[in-house]
Amino acid sequence: MIVKKMPILQGFPDFETVKFFTGKFFQKYNFTPVFYDIETTGLSRNSTYLYLIGAVGIEDETWNFYQWMAENANEEETILRIFSQFLQQCDLLISYNGDRFDQPYLEARYEKYGIPSPFTGKQSLDLYLTLKPLKSLLKLSAMKQPCMEEFLGIKDRIYDNGKECIKLYKDFLKKRDAFTADEILGHNLEDVLGLGRIFDMLGYLCIYDGDY
């Protein structure tokens, strides 16, 4: 398994910004959020598997970025168990389309291995669903994450999209080369850091709702 951890020193919303906006949605909240994104070998929860999780959490008053990547299908269960442990102190999960894909996918994989769901009792902020009312207001062509980032003027993505990453991962399983692994990890890093950037669009939602 490939494991990465690094502090996020810039390009992510500060604690007070995250606390302010999440506080508008959740009253019973102790501010232990986790931003996360997953990479899988396909969309089906039953015939494909999880191979990478990227997450951002708070440690020692610093945002830290974590990644766990399977080097073969047998490591999926280990990643699921590690992520479950990681979420023990978390009370809010922040994702993009996570309510419709990431969380249901993970729930199915946890069930497959007989592992209790780590999502029980935790709140979820799906930025895709939450920001959807802004599509017409901001005249967005689509609600995909890269489209939202482009609206914000963020055009610094350099890695392949999720679909291409599936092909890259299959190549990685054959070749085991570090360059391909870095390509996959880089895409996931951009997705997770993108969550922080899109999070700031909750400010537009306050204007939309007249809450300013």
Which residues does each predicted region cover?
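Short glycine-rich phosphate-binding loop at a beta-alpha junction
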Residues: 92-97
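Metal-dependent phosphoesterase core characteristic of DEDDh/y 3'-5' exonuclease domains
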Residues: 48-57, 63-64, 98-202
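Acidic catalytic cores of enzymes that act on phosphate-bearing nucleotides/polynucleotides
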Residues: 200, 205-212
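Nucleic-acid-processing active sites and adjacent nucleic-acid-binding tracks
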Residues: 64-84
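Conserved beta-strand scaffold positions in the cores of enzyme catalytic domains, especially
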Residues: 33-35, 65-67, 124
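Two-metal-ion RNase H-like nuclease active-site motif
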Residues: 32-41, 188
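N-terminal accessory regions of nucleic-acid-interacting proteins
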Residues: 1-30
